[in-house]
Amino acid sequence: MEGAPQAAYFNNLADQWWANDGAFSVLHSMNPARISFIKKLVNQFFPKNGLKNLNVLDVGCGGGIVCEPLARLGAKVTGIDASEQAILAARAHAHEYNLSIQYECKSLKDIKRSYDLVTCLEVVEHVDNLSDFIHELTKKIKVGGTLILSTLNRTVFSYVVGISGAEYIAKKVPVGTHDWQKFLEPFELISIVEKYGMKAVSLEGLNYSLLKREWYLGGQLRMNYIVGFQKKILD
């Protein structure tokens, strides 16, 4: 699912981006762990000011789940998405909470500037021409800048839990959201990204604690994971 069909799919879910127990509730519950990873990596490569005034591009931003906490932490955030309805939902929610975020319904190729940080979370598993997409992502990053990706590993566990469990049994995710064949093992994703002048600098699992009922960083990589890259500084 990519391009117009993907945009239409998420257009139909636009009213659920900020709904309690809606179609994106899993992303909301995962978000504190994802933001923690982002903060840690940004503080490593931008130790002086961290996220404050950092120019950030969030690709596949949806309703703004990642953009909003980054903006609250002081970043100058642009979010892009192919779904016009998702962008409208993102703008409305940001306006409601008086957040200054630039949301645009456009493709990655239409972005003509570069950023300190590019995030693309839970997106690459929906992309058909992945190598071309990754190449475009890397073009939007300044030398020395950072790219952060998160996605699902292609394992038996991710099929049983991520698709059969989440989509068909628990119904936490709409049926048809994921195609297991598009899930990527970490080494596959890293090898694609590193072809385009990037270096993997951090890889962590994203796991769910049934006891604490929350997502956390660390542990196994058998389902969700998040990986950070730095654009190589030329000698």
Residue ranges of each PLM-predicted region?
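Conserved alpha-helix/loop element of class I SAM-dependent methyltransferases that forms part
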Residues: 29-52
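N-terminal, positively charged/glycine-rich alpha-helical extensions of SAM-dependent methyltransferases
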Residues: 1-20
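Acceptor-substrate binding/catalytic loop of class I
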Residues: 151, 171-188
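Conserved SAM-binding loop
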Residues: 45-159, 186, 227-231
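Class I (Rossmann-like) S-adenosyl-L-methionine-dependent methyltransferase catalytic domain
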Residues: 15, 19-21, 26-31, 40
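Short, flexible, mixed-charge acidic loops at enzyme active sites
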Residues: 158-168
